[in-house]
């Protein structure tokens, strides 16, 4: 009989899983991985760990997605655990918005699990959330005119924050497959445009669409995906751990561009390779 771990659903639809930190630490990695495939994401509160313990935890889930050798410059040279500390002048590691996306696509890397841990949170209550979207359910219930575009049109993206992506990402525009059928789920790889006034790390386009049409599509799609049935918003507190199955959900970061806010997260990524 397969191991089980006690959890409570996060969302009214039954999606997501709250797990007590004691149960999480005692559970087998494989049990949590299987739960993630079904529930999409896991939230653990009050987990008191340092960056080494964080690495020990996430490294058990698969092959660490790390950037060494010819990829050593990625993320300004972070290698494995990326510290998201709200650096001025940076975007991915900065304080601005990161609109809906899945990890790995811009660096042509397979990323199956994403781990975020709150090392230090101060002076922020209702800003800088990480949000998670149940794209599989959303696509089942989506208006046909939106789904048709996702399934039939060609989506491209180009990176703008060269200091982060260095020369690992392709130059110029490149195609990103929106859906990849993995059998148990259709993985979604999509990069939403940044809001006006936000420094942009990437830029998407839809081949054959005007700028106006592209903007209108993403606005309507974003409004649909952000309905409470599909959308969870996590406001960070010290000791929070959020694990996402990168094939089962897409996520975003809301801006927290206030000098008084301290929002230090550790990020790890693993792949089933």
From Swiss-Prot:
Top enzyme category: oxidoreductase
Alphabetical list of Pfam families matching this protein: TauD
Binding site for substrate: 104
Main location: cytoplasm
Binding site for 2-oxoglutarate: 130, 253, 263, 267
E.C. designation(s): 1.14.20.3
Binding site for Fe cation: 101, 103, 251
Recorded catalytic activity of this chain's protein: (3S,5S)-carbapenam-3-caboxylate + 2-oxoglutarate + O2 = (5R)-carbapenem-3-carboxylate + succinate + CO2 + H2O
Disulfides per UniProt: none
Keyword terms, alphabetized: Antibiotic biosynthesis, Cytoplasm, Dioxygenase, Iron, Metal-binding, Oxidoreductase
Superkingdom of the source species: Bacteria
Compartments reported by the entry: Cytoplasm
InterPro entries linked: AlphaKG_dependent_hydroxylases, TauD-like_sf, TauD/TfdA-like
Cross-referenced Gene3D superfamilies: Clavaminate synthase-like
Gene Ontology MF, one: metal ion binding
Regulation: Inhibited by L-N-acetylproline and by D-N-acetylproline.
CC cofactor: Fe(2+)
Function noted in UniProt: Catalyzes the Fe(2+) and alpha-ketoglutarate-dependent conversion of (3S,5S)-carbapenam to (5R)-carbapenem, an essential step in carbapenem antibiotic biosynthesis.
Family under the similarity heading: Belongs to the TfdA dioxygenase family.
Name of the protein: (5R)-carbapenem-3-carboxylate synthase
Organism: Pectobacterium carotovorum subsp. carotovorum (Erwinia carotovora subsp. carotovora)
Originating gene: carC
């Amino acid at each position: 009989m397969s191991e089980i771990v006690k959890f409570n659903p996060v969302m009214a639809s039954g999606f997501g899983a709250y797990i007590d930190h004691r149960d999480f630490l005692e559970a087998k990695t494989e049990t949590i991985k299987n739960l993630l495939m079904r529930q999409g994401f896991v939230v653990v509160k009050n987990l008191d760990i340092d960056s080494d313990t964080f690495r020990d935890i996430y490294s058990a889930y698969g092959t660490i997605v790390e950037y060494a050798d010819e990829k050593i410059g990625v993320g300004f040279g972070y290698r494995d655990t990326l510290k998201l500390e709200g650096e001025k002048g940076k975007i991915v590691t900065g304080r601005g918005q990161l609109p809906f996306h899945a990890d790995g696509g811009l660096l042509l890397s397979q990323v199956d699990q994403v781990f975020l841990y709150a090392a230090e949170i101060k002076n922020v209550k209702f800003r800088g959330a990480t949000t998670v979207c149940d794209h599989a359910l959303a696509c089942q219930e989506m208006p046909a005119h939106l789904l048709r575009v996702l399934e039939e049109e060609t989506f491209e993206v180009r990176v703008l924050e060269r200091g982060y992506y260095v020369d690992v990402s392709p130059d110029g525009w490149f195609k990103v497959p929106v859906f990849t059928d993995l059998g148990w789920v259709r993985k979604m790889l999509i990069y939403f445009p940044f809001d006006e006034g936000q420094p942009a790390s990437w830029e998407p386009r839809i081949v054959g669409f005007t700028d106006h049409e592209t903007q209108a599509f993403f606005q309507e799609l974003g409004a649909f995906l952000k309905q409470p049935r599909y959308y969870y918003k996590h406001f960070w507190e010290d000791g929070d751990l959020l694990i996402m199955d990168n094939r089962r959900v897409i996520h975003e970061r809301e801006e927290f561009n206030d000098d008084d806010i301290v929002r230090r997260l550790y990020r790890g990524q693993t792949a089933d390779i």
